[in-house]
Design a protein with these regions (language model features):
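Conserved C-terminal helix/tail region of periplasmic/extracytoplasmic solute-binding proteins
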Residues: 138-178
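Residue-level signal for the start and early helices of compact helical domains
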Residues: 19, 29, 44-46, 72, ...
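Helix N-cap / beta->alpha transition motif
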Residues: 41, 56, 121, 165-173
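Short beta-strand-to-loop elements that line the ligand-binding cleft
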Residues: 1-5
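Secondary-structure end/capping motifs
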Residues: 62-155
């Protein structure tokens, strides 16, 4: 097993230098278009890899209303995304991709990418963050991410101990969203 940059992984796959690869968007869609067969993904593996918004703790504690307002704006965008057909988002997504990554994004691949990634409404997020009686789903996901990065030596065991329970993933500010 070799840890490589996604572009290098895709090149190795295209050159038949490997038997299996781990890719994420957009590279997984490019590989699929070139004949790759997906053996598993985050869903079939029973895991999650959510978008994580991180706030500076001191700022968030000092200005909880502003922090919640930011989340409210983000969640309005999520709601708009969920209500808009993916086909109507392609051009804007391609523009974003070109700006962010510096590359063009094929229309069909951009559509697959938009359709593949889940986004969660406020109500869904409150459910995912509910830690009543047990670690929340998000805390479990974050714990799995920490364990993965520890296992491939991207973070040390000491660093992993700081985040391995996922308890930093909290619904405190989500509950303040109006």
């Amino acid at each position: 097993i070799k840890n490589m940059d996604q572009a290098q992984v895709l090149k190795a796959f295209e050159s038949n230098e490997c038997d299996g690869v781990a890719l994420w968007a957009p590279h997984m869609f490019v590989a699929a278009n070139k004949g790759a067969v997906m053996a598993a993904d985050v869903r079939t593996a029973g895991k999650g890899n959510p978008v994580v918004l991180v706030a500076d703790t001191r700022y968030a504690e000092k200005y909880p209303d502003i922090t919640a307002s930011f989340l409210g704006v983000f969640l309005r965008a999520v709601d708009a995304f969920k209500k808009t057909p993916a086909e109507d988002l392609i051009a804007e997504y391609q523009r974003f991709y070109k700006t962010f990554v510096g590359k063009d994004y094929d229309t069909a691949l951009a559509l697959k990418d938009l359709q593949y990634h889940p986004v969660f409404s406020l109500e869904e997020q409150l459910e995912l963050f509910d830690d009543t009686g047990a670690p929340s789903q998000v805390q479990q996901w974050q714990s799995s991410v920490a364990a993965f990065f520890r296992d491939i030596n991207r973070i040390t065991s000491d660093e992993a101990k700081k985040v391995e329970d996922g308890k930093y993933a909290t619904n405190t500010y989500l509950k303040l969203v109006k």
